[in-house]
């Protein structure tokens, strides 16, 4: 059976934005998985995985979340892994890159607004731009939601972005 995994650090993100996509995947024969730090029941999700994500990227607990996510990716063969939210996006792509099943899954990342943008501080650019540029090599498809992010993503030299 085909499998898709949605990753976000909080379940509210999935509940507010991705239920139609989970339903479409289910309707097309996919087993749907969601990895978040919550326990609320998510419609159209066959299997939920509680990962101890923390909102702050500097929180030490995110190291544990990385290991939990990598274990999940090693134990389950996913066809598609779709990462969301800043922490979910970073940890999801890194865990995939360090998993034994990375040759199987295609990894998607939806940038719901980069932290570096025209009016962002220099610190945001110094911190977040290099991280996203580095992680681009672990991204098969990057989806952006605004023109400025699309323009910035072109500098990452990805093979696919929208």
Tell me the role of every PLM-derived stretch.
Residues 1-37:
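N-terminal subdomain of nucleotide-sugar transferases
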Residues 24-64, 71-75, 160-161:
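Conserved nucleotide-sugar phosphate-binding/catalytic loop shared by glycosyltransferases and other
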Residues 83-89, 111:
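Short His-centered aromatic/hydrophobic patch
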Residues 16-17, 60-67, 106, 116-134:
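Nucleotide-sugar donor phosphate/pyrophosphate-binding loop at the beta->alpha transition
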Residues 23-28, 67-70, 125-142:
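Membrane-proximal helix-turn-helix segments that form the acceptor-binding/catalytic region
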Residues 3-5, 97-115, 132, 143:
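Active-site proximal beta-strand in glycosyltransferases
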Residues 138-162:
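A short, active-site helix/loop in glycosyltransferases that binds the activated sugar's phosphate group
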Residues 40, 87-88, 148-150:
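Alpha-helix capping/helix-boundary segments
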């Amino acid at each position: 059976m085909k499998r898709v995994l949605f990753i976000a650090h909080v379940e509210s993100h999935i509940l507010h934005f991705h239920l139609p996509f989970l339903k479409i995947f289910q309707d097309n024969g996919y087993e749907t998985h969601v990895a978040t730090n919550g326990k609320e029941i998510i419609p159209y999700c066959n299997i939920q995985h509680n990962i101890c994500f923390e909102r702050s990227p500097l929180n030490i607990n995110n190291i544990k979340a990385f290991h939990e996510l990598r274990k999940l990716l090693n134990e389950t063969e996913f066809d598609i892994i779709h990462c969301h939210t800043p922490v979910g996006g970073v940890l999801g792509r890194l865990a995939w890159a360090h998993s034994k099943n990375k040759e199987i899954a295609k990894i998607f990342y939806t940038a719901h607004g980069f932290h570096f943008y025209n009016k962002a501080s220099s610190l945001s650019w110094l911190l977040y731009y290099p991280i996203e540029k580095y992680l681009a090599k672990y991204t098969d498809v990057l989806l952006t939601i605004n023109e400025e992010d699309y323009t910035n993503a072109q500098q990452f030299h990805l093979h696919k972005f929208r």
